[in-house]
Amino acid sequence: MGKTVINCKPYFKAATPQGHPQSWIVPDLCKAYNWPANLAGGGVIAIVELDGGWVQSDMDSYFQSIGQPNPQITDVSVDGTANNPNQHLGDPRDPDYEVAMDIQVAAAAYFVATGQPATIRVYWAQDIASAVQAATADGCDVCSISWGADEALWGVDAAQQMEAAAAAATAAGMVVFAASGDNDSSDGGPTPANVDLPSSCPHMIGCGGTNKTATTETVWNDEPGETSGEGTGGGFSTIFPVQPFQAGAPNGPGRMVPDVAADADPMTGYTLFTHGAEVTGEGGTSAVAPLYAGLFAAFGTKLGFVSPTLWSNQLCFNDITQGDNGAYRAEPGPDPCSGLGSPIGTKLANLLATSDAQASAAGV
């Protein structure tokens, strides 16, 4: 069966100037999430991109500004698609911002956990499944996907192709994270409840969004300074059935999304570097997938289909109990707004890192 190319969109958002965003630098956000340190690392991070590009000078400026060494970044053209920056200047959906966010967040999060520069391979392709297959063939350890579209736009055949690629990736030991979308529970669709794909694939870890301050964390939904209808994606798949590993999930007609969450609200967003300038208030669930990818790459082992382990260890996450994404409200325990919650980095490291990495983190 040939590949189906879906018109996917990048899931980054920017706060409007009147929004006065509070902006995190990644090392400080990692500290707020109790990131581990001195892990063994060694994991290779795959990042999937469908458009846009990056330039070295932006990376130099960003990593110098946060006191980290540059990561090792390799571009991989899967089907002729290539790193092609500065083609959408002035477009509010300029995908260069997506590419910068993915690389900068993943690499910075990895360095905080390991003290080592990250190794990143950026896979350029017209369709996500082909990029995931290429990353699997290359032996990458984790994969971050910040592009997607409403399940209805994919249809069953393309969704099954995507899930097959994800299942093969996890069978080879790769963990795959995917943004759950930025248009609340509707996912920009015609009804109040639609989920985003590929995050709804059972072998992906769907990544939802929160509003994270120094003292509070709630579900990300639109606020003053944001466009109406913005907020974390989440809900229940109409293509993939209920998953046995999602113990404790609310009753629904299909696989629940997201599995996990972290800061995504542009009003509590990220400080990054793109087009020769520092930018603040960058957000979207696009930031959450690379944040987790950076952490999991630090664990020093091929975890593969790790979702059942995460769902069996819910105390490794900060439960988000306030807020909604339109059709669904946060509640104690897993919910279709924030999944299991936001990461407690040290607990996840104790659960998942290799014994050598755990010993290093403990100073043994």
Spans of features found by a protein language model:
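Acidic/polar loop patches that form or flank catalytic/metal-binding clefts of enzymes
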Residues: G206-G208, A214-V219, K302-N313, F317-N318, ...
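An often Trp-containing, charged/polar helix-loop segment at the C-terminal end
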Residues: A293-P336, L340, I344, D356
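Short clusters of hydrophobic/aromatic residues that line enzyme substrate/ligand-binding pockets
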Residues: P198, W220, F245, L272, ...
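N-terminal low-complexity, intrinsically disordered patches enriched in charged
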Residues: E217, A293, L348-N350
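Substrate-binding/charge-relay-adjacent region of secreted/lumenal peptidase catalytic domains
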Residues: M1-G209, G233-G284, G300-P308, I344-T354
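Low-complexity, Gly/Ser/Thr/Pro-rich intrinsically disordered linker/tail segments
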Residues: G333, L352-V364
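C-terminal substrate/ligand-recognition segments
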Residues: G283-A297
